[in-house]
Amino acid sequence: MVFLGGNLEVPFSASVLLPDEQGSYLATKHLTELGHSKILCVGGPRKFSIFRDRFRGYTKALEEAGITVNSQLMVEIPLTFQAAYQFGLEFLSNAHQKVTAVFTHNDPTACGMMKAAQNLGIKVPEELSIVGFDNTFVTRLTNPTLTSVNIPKKLVGKRLVEMLIRLIRGNNIPNCVIEEVSLDIKESTAPVNTR
C-alpha cells in the first residue's frame, strides 16, 4: 500500500509525505507580512498528523513574527463548506472575537468562511483576509479569488504511482518526501485595515 500524508507503520507500505507544516507556515507568514496579528486558524482534528503539522506551521510563523499564539484562535471543525459556513457565522458575528485574517486547512473550509463573512457584511479582503490550502479549482471561482497553499498535485500523483509500482514488484522502498510548496496569492488577502 502507498499512503498519501502521514507516516504510518504498516508492513509492505510507504508514504508520500507532504510539506504541510511548510505550507501553513507560508500562508501564515504571508498574513503576518500584511500586518495581520489576529489570525484565526480553522483546521482539522489534531489526532491526524497532517493537521498537527498544519497547526505547527501556523504557530511557527506567528512566533517568528513576535505574535503570541492564542489557542482560542486555533479551532478544529469538520473541514467542509457547510461546517465552516456555520462556524463562521457564529464566530465572526461575535465582536469580542475580532480577527483580521483566517487561515484554513483546506479550500472548502476557506470558501465556507468567506461566504459567512460576506453574509455578515464583512468585506473580503478589505476587512478580513482569507487563505485556504490545496489550491483546488474552486479558488478561481470564488469572488474574490482565493489565496491558497499550492501542493504540486501532478508530482504527488507521479510519486504515488512510482512507489506503488515498485511495491508491486516486491521492492522495499522508503517514504518519499515532497518538499515543493508555494503560496498562490490571489485576491482574498490584503494588508490589514488600520482604520
Regions found by a protein language model. Name each.
Residues 1-3, 13-15, 41, 74, ...:
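Conserved beta-strand scaffold positions in the cores of enzyme catalytic domains, especially
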Residues 1-26, 108, 134-146:
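Flexible loop/hinge segments that line or gate small-molecule binding clefts
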Residues 1-8, 59, 116-127:
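A short, gly/pro- and small-residue-rich
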Residues 5, 17, 43, 76, ...:
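Short beta-strand/turn micro-motifs composed of small residues
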Residues 14-41, 56, 60, 81-91, ...:
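Hydrophobic alpha-helical segments within soluble ligand-binding/sensing domains
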Residues 73-83:
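Short beta->alpha junction loops
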Residues 87-195:
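Flexible loop/turn connectors
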